[in-house]
Structures are given as structure tokens and as C-alpha cells.
Amino acid sequence: MSLTRLLIKDFRNIENADLALSPGFNFLVGANGSGKTSVLEAIYTLGHGRAFRSLQPGRVIRHEQEAFVLHGRLQSEERETSIGLTKDKQGDSKVRIDGTDGHKIAELAHLMPMQLITPEGFTLLNGGPKYRRAFLDWGCFHNEAGFFTAWSNLKRLLKQRNAALRQVSRYEQLRPWDKELIPLAEQISTWRAEYSSAIAQDMADTCQQFLPEFSLTFSFQRGWEKETDYADVLERSFERDRMLTYTAHGPHKADFRIRADGAPVEDTLSRGQLKLLMCALRLAQGEFLTRESGRRCLYLIDDFASELDDARRGLLASRLKATQSQVFVSAISAEHVIDMSDENSKMFTVEKGKITD
């Protein structure tokens, strides 16, 4: 599925934009601060309900406006789908699909699977475990129909359990929460483990092409001891959890560890190599989705040229073209992306929030 039309109103520095898009490569060229990243962020927000540079809605709404409006048309082989998102300064959202309101943001995420590659995306590799959990959970969300509901219920129960830890004196008082929490935790951990195992070879093959000088390994850590029943862990950890006032073990503490030649990648790779690894992981994940479900990702790449030499840019471009997916690329200069262009590409110039093609 590709995004054939994008309408943006009062988002960042963009007052109004109506873009007819290519199903292949779309290039956004402009100086720093021109608004080219804002276009990528508008697409991301349309599919996620939130921006990738700010979690506060007021910061992405254009100055002195009350809300932003995003609208898109998605085209698949079978049909066209109309989608829309409005969000005000209080964070209240309205999702519209095919002309009807009342839809959930998760429905937009399902319709628009996308991979984001930005200069800030290094957190996948050198940030905390939550970023790598999010990487796995993206795959589980798009591969397991029940994942989102289970994950949402897990978050709710953990919040309730942590609140209860401040009030209880005996473990038996927590059993009502743990009775619901334990099967959810085990199911989510099983899905994550299965997904990480299924995609491991895809990641290894892609990483070998991008970083042949390293031997990369991947390991899933579920968030509590191996070969240990989660129910036993919760009961055994009760006094410590009560003292900390939060649940110290569980799927919310899981990690997906990535090593190069046996050492953590953040201690071994240069910034350029980290960017290559990030690109390889995002590509592998998108290609795995296509192979398993027949659905293609949208790829959003901000500041394409940074950290990469000509050869590596060429490799990334050729791999992206091979996916036959829709790709959005921002760059300061057209010279950085002209080699990627073909007869099906579109080049947009962005200047002070105005977009022309």
C-alpha cells in the first residue's frame, strides 16, 4: 500500500500543503529549518498519532492555531482508503477512515506500517532497552493479531499493580492482579521470542551486506530469569517490589541485545557504522513483513546523506529500490539524492514551510 495523496494543515511550520506522491521515491530537498523533516513527521504522525520529534501536541501545531489536520489517501492493489487525523493542543485526537469517525490510532498504524530512519534513531542501538522493545513490538504488532490488546492490558495491569504495591502488606493482596498479569506476560514474551527468532537470519544477512567487517549476534532477554516461572518470580520479589513501589521483573524489562564481535555495538561501532546497522535492521524488518504478509512498509529517511559515504548511500538506495516500497527521503541538496532518482520519482523543494514540485 502506498500513500498517493497527502494534505497537511497547521503542522509545524506548514500552513497548507497538498502533495501528489509517487509510489516509489519521493525526495524532499531544502535547507535546515525549511520544513522538509516536518513533511516526514506529518506522514509519521498520520500513521502513529504522535510526532517523532516531540510528544507534546502543542509543539507540532502551527503557531497560534488550535489543531493540526492531516489527511491521506492510501492505494493498494485492491482498493483506495481515505484516512485522516486531527489533534488539538490538549492532545485530543479524532481519527477518520473512509469518511467515518470513531476509529483508533492503532487502526492507522495497521494500515500504514512504516520504518523511520533519522539522526535521532541511534537510540535503537545506544539508548535504553525500551527502544529495542519497541523494535520487537512493532514486529509483533504487525504479525500477531492479538498483540496490541494484550500489550495494552499488560500496561494497564502493571500500572494498577504498582499502585497497589504502595498499599498492601502481604503478597496475597496482590494475587488478583497477578492472576491476570501472569498469562499476559508469558504470552507477550512468547510472541517476542518467536519474532526475534524468526527475523534473526534476515537481520544477520542484511547486516552482513552493510557491515561485512563485523560478526553480529542478536539475543532476546525476556525480563526475568531463564527457566523460571513468572508466578514464582513475582511472589519471590514481593518485598523488594514493595520497597521499590514498582514491579522489577517482567516483559516491561525485556531487552533485545545486539553485539558486534562479542561486544555491545555502542562500544564498538563508529557513528557511521551505527547508522548502517540501524538502516540494516529497519530494512530487514520491513522485508520480513513483506515476505510474511505481502504488505510493504513506507520508509521515512531524514537527512539521508549524514554519516554515510557515497558507496554506503548507493548500497542503501539499491536495497530500498529492491523492496519496491514507497520511500520518502529528505536531504539538504538534490546532489545527495539525484543518483537515486528515476522516471517514477518525485522531487519536492521545501522552503519556509512551502512545498513545490
UniProtKB/Swiss-Prot annotation:
Keyword Mitochondrion: no
One GO molecular-function entry: single-stranded DNA binding
Compartment list: Cytoplasm
Family annotation (Pfam families): SMC_N
Stored InterPro entries: DNA-binding_RecF, DNA-binding_RecF_CS, P-loop_NTPase, RecF/RecN/SMC_N, RecF_2
One record GO biological process: DNA replication
Gene3D superfamilies from the UniProt entry: P-loop containing nucleotide triphosphate hydrolases, RecF/RecN/SMC, N-terminal domain
Gene: recF
Entry binding sites for ATP: 30-37
Function: The RecF protein is involved in DNA metabolism; it is required for DNA replication and normal SOS inducibility. RecF binds preferentially to single-stranded, linear DNA. It also seems to bind ATP.
Keyword Lyase: no
PANTHER family in the cross-refs: DNA REPLICATION AND REPAIR PROTEIN RECF
Protein name: DNA replication and repair protein RecF
Organism whose genome encodes this protein: Salmonella typhimurium (strain LT2 / SGSC1412 / ATCC 700720)
Family the UniProt entry places it in: Belongs to the RecF family.
Key words, A-Z: ATP-binding, Cytoplasm, DNA damage, DNA repair, DNA replication, DNA-binding, Nucleotide-binding, SOS response
GO cellular component, as recorded: cytoplasm
